Amino acid sequence: MIGRRSTLPIAIMLIDCSIGTDDVVIHELKKIPAVAYAYKLIRYHDIIVKLESNSEEELRKTISGKIRKLDNILGTITVVALEK
């Protein structure tokens, strides 16, 4: 919802993956508890992911320790939402 802010730390990731592996990567992403959603994209990136976590540290560990280490991921762009 517009204007409504979750109290959990959130991040949005754009993921580039090896050709033809987007379904496999999405399947693996959905196994990670912090992944709120993962959708295929058309054009500049392959997948968009929303992450929610209990803490910023847990969010960082999920991004660096789990998602970026998945097979077939070539690159990521991550933005983390901050409180005002």
Model-predicted segments: where are they?
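A compositional/biophysical signature of low hydrophobicity enriched in polar/charged and small residues
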Residues: 1-84
